[in-house]
Amino acid sequence: MKAGFVGVGAMGAAMAGHVQAKGQGEVFAYDVRREAVDALADQGIKPVDTLADITRAADVIVVIVVDDQQVLDVTEALSVDGVEGTLIAVAATVHPDTMRKAAEIAAAKGLRVIDAPVCFGLYGAKEGQLASLCGGSAEDIEDARPVLDCYSRAVHHIGPLGCGQIAKTVNNMLHWANCVANYEALLIAKRFGIDAQKLREVLLQCPARNGTLADWDSTRFTWPIKDMDIALALAREGELTLPLYGQVDHLVQTLTPDGVKGLLYGDAAPYLGRTVTAKDEGGHGG
């Protein structure tokens, strides 16, 4: 099976590398940044110059681009000269409606689409330990599985088209809420003179443990705005009132990797315009 990747930034490049190393066929790559594609040549991944080239070369095409409009634009371009039966697996995180629009565009030319967004971020991509949350027909997902398996610890079929994106959004909601909850809770520890990193290690053996806390050092806080926009849009469409997530949407945007490092390993941590230190080291500052 020949695989193609559209979008070979840090995530896409790592995923393509695993498919090349573990797969059973050629791997092709396209990116608007030619240098990103050329950087993969020493792994045996073949560069292509246009989206038309990749749609003619690959049986399964993994799309991991930035946003909804890019997914639609890429699907449109892939479909123009696409080979009937070619399967597009959207690994980007987008709104479920975007998946349905993409599927309509592709179906008009005989191409197939599934949603296959991934969890565990850049670390999971580098280690080949992502979780693929898939929406689409069982047949299409099984056809994509030989490619998805190469970079995934597990491939889950959640339901019809769009359900993978909903599942990814639910995961993101819990992840970002945990980021805020972990930060605020450990601020209490720091304020009262407890080593936050040592307490984190203890909490990972207690009922309060969560996956976000375990991997907190690697959280990059790259996409909270996009992720929460999708979550709150789904809440509105579902006529749901979710007051907690209105607060999470605001608070998670104040967190940074440096702030987490300061909280866990430093003498002070920033939060909401203040600098929090232990009481016996001068109070909360700010």
Give the label of every model feature segment.
Residues 1-63:
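NAD(P)+-binding Rossmann beta1-loop-alpha1 motif at the extreme N-terminus of oxidoreductases
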Residues 3, 93-169:
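Rossmann-fold dinucleotide-binding core
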Residues 162-274:
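Helical "substrate-binding/catalytic lid" subdomain
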